[in-house]
Amino acid sequence: MKKLVYFIVGVLFFTQSCEQKKEAPKELALNTVTYENALDVPVNKVGVLINIDSLGFFDHNSQNLDQNIDSKSIENQLKQINSKFDIVKIIRDKSEKILNDNKYTYQMIDKFDKNLVPNELITKENVNQVKFNDLKKAINQDDLVLINVKSGLDYDPANKQKYIAKTYVYINILDLKNNALKYSETAGGTKYFDKDINKITTDYLQKMIKESLNETINLIDKKY
């Protein structure tokens, strides 16, 4: 009789252990959903918002853009470029091509309050800065593709007498129905200057910033 009791208890324990092992991967899968790229993310009614930061100077070796620039001549040159360099059109054309090629139905959003969203990569650490309720009042969509762009200058780490031009494109997908972040990624391009700081013209500066933007676009092209 004892052997029979031990056998029944053993079978029950083994059955429960198997059931627990079967359930664990399912929970893990639900908590670790990741996507290879933005096109893998399931979306419904989609709005696309392009948020371009003014050209500035990056805090060295970071992606933080500062509009307070030590050099007045460089500051004035960047202001001139800002007034005539239409980054929005370049990013918009690229975004529309990718979305059209992949048969998305979407709405481009031209007017918005920049205070409603962070101007960088959105992560679980800063998603609380997204003002979802205000966004939903302004945007009648289920999902929002937010494309943040930062372009500017930094010092060449190998030669402080030269600059580098950098452009970062942050692709964020927000779930407006559930106040959640679905996906985010960064693409960044860098161009090294051939000329020393004191020999830079506005045209050369614009050329290098545009090349850093093109390099970033090329990275996106290769992925999408």
Please state what every model-predicted region is:
Residues 50, 91-103, 216, 220, ...:
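Sec/Tat-exported extracytoplasmic proteins
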Residues 55-146, 180, 184:
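N-terminal segment of the mature soluble domain
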Residues 18-47, 54-58, 161-224:
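C-terminal/domain-edge helix-coil "capping" segments
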Residues 124-192:
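A charged, solvent-exposed segment within the mature domains of Sec-exported extracytoplasmic proteins
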Residues 12, 58, 156-158:
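Short glycine-/acidic-enriched loop or helix-start segments at secondary-structure transitions
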Residues 49-52, 148-150:
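Active-site-proximal beta-strand/loop segments in catalytic clefts of secreted hydrolases
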Residues 4-14:
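Sec-dependent N-terminal signal peptides
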